[in-house]
């Protein structure tokens, strides 16, 4: 949420026009700008293991519940990302299905796992995590938040994730600044 304080004689900022009226910027769109996972330019890897929750919390969407230990949830590659928190790092880092990322026709594993849990309850919990599930890289988090590719981040990996999560996404900041500029300068 943005709160703007502008004198009444300076005009009222209008909400920005959506920057993506016909096509939302999806997680897949953001990640497709980067080099292949694990190669230079996309190799600030998170080493936290992914383990399923012993007592998963289900929501209607497989991307909304707590199906894994920690606060890192799987990202829906076909939708805009939820806000990336400053607490990313370790098991709070979002999860990517690398197989579904590389092959868009393949349904993400999380969908079938969620269906099993929804249908069969706790008896469907598995500890067998497929090797193609992985954590988001620093570069991927930055791309999702619309930072320029190749931007340098400081400190250890957890500090880099915190910088990305604490910042206003650049495209959002630009849209808000333009709305204020238009209100003040016409």
Say what each PLM segment does.
Residues 1-186:
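S-adenosyl-L-methionine-dependent DNA methyltransferase catalytic core
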């Amino acid at each position: 949420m943005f709160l703007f304080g502008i004198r009444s004689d300076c005009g009222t900022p209008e909400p920005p026009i959506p920057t993506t009226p016909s096509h939302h910027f999806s997680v897949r769109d953001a990640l497709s700008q980067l080099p292949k996972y694990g190669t230079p330019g996309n190799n600030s890897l998170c080493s936290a293991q992914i383990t399923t929750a012993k007592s998963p919390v289900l929501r209607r969407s497989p991307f909304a519940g707590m199906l894994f230990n920690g606060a890192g949830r799987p990202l829906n590659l076909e939708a805009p990302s939820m806000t990336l928190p400053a607490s990313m790092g370790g098991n709070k880092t979002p999860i990517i299905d690398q197989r579904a990322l590389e092959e868009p026709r393949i349904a993400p594993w999380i969908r079938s796992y969620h269906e099993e849990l929804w249908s069969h309850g706790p008896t469907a919990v598995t500890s067998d995590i497929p090797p193609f599930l992985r954590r988001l890289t620093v570069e991927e988090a930055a791309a999702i938040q619309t930072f320029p590719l190749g931007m340098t981040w400081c400190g250890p990996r957890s500090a880099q994730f915190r910088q990305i999560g604490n910042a206003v996404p650049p495209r959002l900041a630009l849209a808000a600044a333009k709305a204020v500029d238009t209100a003040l300068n016409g």
